[in-house]
């Protein structure tokens, strides 16, 4: 839920304390003309919504594997769609496993089983070992 701008905090486009309002006439000729235009006072620009993406992480992995290789924006878009698709598949399968076992929380065990079910052979083995390594690293860093 977005916060409404408060009167005490100056924002871009809103008047500050002590300064004349945008629509009020000033001593110059421009201010008097602005007062004549109706409904254009206190125009606050809408902030652009940030688009979430795995782009920075994909780029970091690319540089680890091939330091001298770049990626186009179209290629990044394809990779981002791929990661989102795999994420949704794993989350969906883990959710089904959780409900089948009459539990309410998805644990690392369900994620691991979902990965084994979804990915073929050697790819599943590598994914499980990397996931286990990541969870171990996370739990040791928390202590």
Swiss-Prot record:
Name this polypeptide is given: Histone H2B.2, sperm
Comment on protein domains: Contains 5 SPKK motifs which may interact with the minor groove of A/T-rich DNA sites. Phosphorylation of this motif may regulate DNA binding. This motif is reiterated in both termini of histone H1 and in the C-terminus of plant H2A, but its presence in the N-terminus seems to be unique to sea urchin histones H2B.
Motif (SPKK motif 1) on chain: 4-7
Motif residue range(s): SPKK motif 2: 9-12
Location of region: Disordered: 1-49
Subunit note: The nucleosome is a histone octamer containing two molecules each of H2A, H2B, H3 and H4 assembled in one H3-H4 heterotetramer and two H2A-H2B heterodimers. The octamer wraps approximately 147 bp of DNA.
Any one GO cellular component localisation term in the record: nucleus
Motif (SPKK motif 5): 24-27
Modification sites for Phosphoserine: 14, 19, 24
Higher taxonomy: Eukaryota, Metazoa, Echinodermata, Eleutherozoa, Echinozoa
Cross-link (Glycyl lysine isopeptide (Lys-Gly) (interchain with G-Cter in ubiquitin)): 137
Residues listed as glycosylation sites in the UniProt record: 129
Short sequence motif named SPKK motif 4, residue ranges: 19-22
InterPro entries xrefs: Histone-fold, Histone_H2A/H2B/H3, Histone_H2B, HISTONE_H2B_site
């Amino acid at each position: 839920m977005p916060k409404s701008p408060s009167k005490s905090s100056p924002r871009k486009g809103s008047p500050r304390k002590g300064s004349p309002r945008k629509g009020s006439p000033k001593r110059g000729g421009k201010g008097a003309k602005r007062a004549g235009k109706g409904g254009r006072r206190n125009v606050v620009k809408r902030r652009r919504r940030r688009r979430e993406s795995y782009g920075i992480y994909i780029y970091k992995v690319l540089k680890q594997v091939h330091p001298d290789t770049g990626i186009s924006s179209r290629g990044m878009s394809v990779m981002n769609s791929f990661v989102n698709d795999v994420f949704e598949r794993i989350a969906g399968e883990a959710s089904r496993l959780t409900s089948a076992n009459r539990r309410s929380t998805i644990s690392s065990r369900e994620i691991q089983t979902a990965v084994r079910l979804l990915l073929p052979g050697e790819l599943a083995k590598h994914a499980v070992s990397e996931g286990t390594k990541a969870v171990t690293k996370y739990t040791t860093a928390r202590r």
